[in-house]
Amino acid sequence: MKLDLLTAISPIDGRYRGKTDVLSAYFSEFALIKYRVQVEVEYFITLCELPLPQLKGVDKGVFETLRNIYRNFSEADAQRIKDIESVTNHDVKAVEYFLKEEFDKLGGMDDYKEFIHFGLTSQDINNTSVPLSVKEALEQVYYPQIEELIAQLRTYAEEWAAIPMLAKTHGQPASPTRLGKEIMVFVYRLERQLATLKACPVTAKFGGATGNYNAHHVAYPEYDWKVFGDKFVSEKLGLEREEYTTQISNYDNLSAIFDAMKRINTVMIDMNRDFWQYISMEYFKQKIKAGEVGSSAMPHKVNPIDFENAEGNLGMANAILEHLAVKLPVSRLQRDLTDSTVLRNVGMPFGHIIIAIQSSLKGLRKLLLNEPAIYRDLDNCWSVVAEAIQTILRREAYQHPYEALKALTRTNQAITEVSIKEFIEGLSVSEEIKKELRVITPHTYTGI
């Protein structure tokens, strides 16, 4: 079958393609090839800028023309590289041969072609291309979308800042809180973890076949290739070079990025489950869209499907991120090939995360606050003011206040406003203290 939205194996490229297609520019096979071309071109230019003696004749005016090879990179170019790979059976070598063909088209570059991929191993290209794709996907796709989600949560937190709400710990009534504050918990958590993610350095491996610049040093011992590599990776790619490596990246910092993303996902799972629960408790209703169906059998159903979709996709993302984080830093001796196939899946968790963020936003924007349901729960749970009463009584050195409130409230009998007021009136305290206690209600006992 021809590959399209209906025949794609992964729902990321099929059912959810409309949400994830933006990631193709970073994580598709086309994108990986393009990033490889970019790294190879910039490396050649940097050798010319050094300059190596044999490259002094390269006209600097050709640099922008060379950069246009990757700036204007087309699907036809990518296909040409795949055609070359079908012969070489080596993807990075195919990029090198493609660039030599492009040099031939320019003319006057024949003497310089052998400095394409000079002294490098494939992982000098892969372990710069992949981190660069991750960095740009984070900056251009992920950060804007997660920040949009945080902004939506903050809007609700501010809008509903004064709405009192019965808290639940262990699934049971607890001291009242405020709806806006509970949403602000997620704003706070997401912002903190996002800051941690942004602080993670994006690093790259660039140092030859076993990380020692052997080939560079034997050919040109007069140059400090470590300084060269640091400058190239930093100035041309915007990454940080890992100073000590084997043939491949240590992947420790990439793993840190994946772990940080996983923590953010975990916060989002918690958030989605809470909103799902609030809908189940009828604290929120959902906007109804004409024509939509909630169940094939039950016509009345309006399900919290967006929050469920988000939770499921975040779970998938975390499972993949976990494997990436624990597998990539482990490689036999100076390297084995297990990282290669794993790295090709870096875009997968990004896809699931983007789907989840958009589903979360969709669910949040369908919410309709149902204040009567929230207030009804508060009115039906006067036992939660027991903490307030016993705390004030402790302040006044009243004897055994906790035990007195426990005897009143820890029963299977309903605790009502009347029973609380009767308890207050029976206390051996001043009228001033009783007045202080009388104004405490489940609606007002919400802290600061």
Where are each of the predicted segments found?
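Short, well-ordered beta-strand elements within core beta-sheets of diverse protein domains
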Residues: 181, 255-263, 388-395
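Alpha-helical coiled-coil oligomerization motifs
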Residues: 158-161, 202, 276, 283, ...
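Catalytic-core signal marking the mid-to-C-terminal active-site face
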Residues: 2-29, 64-71, 293-448
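Amphipathic alpha-helical coiled-coil segments and their boundaries
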Residues: 134-135, 142, 183, 250, ...
